[in-house]
């Protein structure tokens, strides 16, 4: 799951748009067009029933640099960050590079699947040094698509303990029939105002080389991330 290198060609609509850009012949500084933001808003609203605002979206070059910037904005050196191991290894370096301590909430492997140890999560989230949870939804590498009930329980624990949820949702389009991806921030106003979501078309649409990703948050602005 961690390698965004597909065995199929990128969609013709993408390759045709790239050809048009190449034919333009000038590759100086560019501004992200409004049409990009409208496409993101439309996609999540139509496909995932998540109503987001244009102002919530920050364009970025990748989810990994986005995670690092968010951790820097929401923590101080020596703060603690929760992760649900086993998990994408770049989570660890993003935490460490910001001078924070990684705290593991290990997933429980049982009956050929993984589940969250909520008792352990409750205990560790209560530590006042824990400032945020890096959530992977759907989870990489476990392959779990967290249910609404699981996400609500995570959110309630984090709200009670004033822990931010930073949700990496890059795999949201890679969901098998019979399972439903739910954006964490879509579940309540409280969750939306205490979370940051990271998305990208790179995994599902074979676009990793184009370096396109989004930070989506009603609570954290571009100004916060630059501070």
Language-model features: locations:
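N-terminal "arm"/small-domain region of PLP-dependent enzymes with the aminotransferase-like
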Residues: 1-28
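A general structural signal for well-ordered alpha-helical segments in protein cores
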Residues: 11, 15, 36-37, 151, ...
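Conserved core of the PLP fold type I
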Residues: 27-156, 173-174, 181-192, 196
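The start of beta-strands in P-loop NTPase/AAA+ ATPase cores
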Residues: 131, 162-164
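Residue-level marker for buried hydrophobic side chains located in beta-strands
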Residues: 137, 165-166
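Walker B catalytic acidic pair
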Residues: 169
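Active-site PLP attachment segment
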Residues: 187-222
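Conserved small/polar residues in nucleotide/adenosyl-binding loops
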Residues: 223-227
